[in-house]
Amino acid sequence: MHWKVAVGVLLALPGPLSAQAAQADSVGARAESAAAVLFKGGEVADAGRVFLGGWAGLVFGEHFMLGGAGITLLEKVELPGSESGTGFDLGMGYGGVILKRWWDLPGRLTGEGGLLLGAGHATVNDRRTGREVGSENFPVLEPEAGLAFRVFRRVYIGASLGYRLVWSIEDLPRVSPDDLRSFSGNLSVRVGGR
């Protein structure tokens, strides 16, 4: 289900938004759109995990993008259990406003930097019963930097490194902010932008 939504956004968004922006602003600078599907690898509670996400936004002057992003953990993390042997599962997702900036490099390469500022939500469930034993909303700040390779005219494959910073985790049993903070390696397919 996640991939269907991501592919739909990737295919549907860039065309209609750039057409609307072109009609609304025929005199000044033209705003276009860009969208991407991304995979993030990093740690959650000392376990290597993969996240699936995407972002979409308006591109101004070919080099600056303002939009929104959403990212979810693909597989829950098993947390240590209590003395009775019951284990717990941690799930999380986050999203928010995303800013991107692209720089022209030689050939088909583009440098990119970005910042996501938003919020996340995590839950801890009893593994045996599935009952939620804790949940928490928390702020997220995630900078990243990387390179993108232009495959076609407006299609790019990118790789970047980032760091997910979270804080104010108080109501999740067996979880601290350090369990949700992590460096990440990111792979993306983007349509639009520079």
Feature locations, PLM:
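Outer-envelope beta-barrel architecture signal
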Residues: 27-33, 62-64, 107-113, 153-157, ...
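Extracytoplasmic loops and strand-loop junctions of Gram-negative outer membrane beta-barrel proteins
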Residues: 36-40, 81-83, 127-130, 170-172
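Transmembrane beta-barrel strands of outer-membrane/channel proteins
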Residues: 33-41, 54, 58, 68-72, ...
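Short glycine/proline- and aromatic-enriched beta-strand/turn motifs that initiate or cap beta-hairpins
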Residues: 19-66, 184-194
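Gram-negative (and chloroplast) outer-membrane scaffold detector with strong preference
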Residues: 63-141, 149-151, 191
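Predominantly the C-terminal beta-signal and adjacent terminal strand-loop region
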Residues: 148-194
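Bacterial N-terminal signal peptides
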Residues: 4-16
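Transmembrane beta-barrel outer-membrane domains
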Residues: 28-30, 45-49, 88-94, 134-140, ...
